[in-house]
Amino acid sequence: MLYALWCTDKKDSLQLRLDTRPPHVEWLNGLNAEGKLKFAGPTLNAEGKPMGSLVVIVADDAASAAALAAQDPYAKAGLFETVEIRPFNWVFNNPEA
């Protein structure tokens, strides 16, 4: 099943995001190689600066999705104010549909 990880950064944490980006990208590449990543990218504020992340992953259940989310270097660094994990139904433009 697909799960959306909707992550919101803590206020004034752009530098932490930038500093932690290389291991975060490495983590995403690992998920991709394992077939667990569907898509990912930053959410942006009105000025076009990153303020969070949207990551859609494959997991057996919500607990497995939460365990994967906890492995994100951004999460480990304390970047996120909140992380919402929700089942996701990719209807339009799904290349596997």
Predicted features along the sequence, with ranges:
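Conserved, structured core segments of small domains
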Residues: 1-97
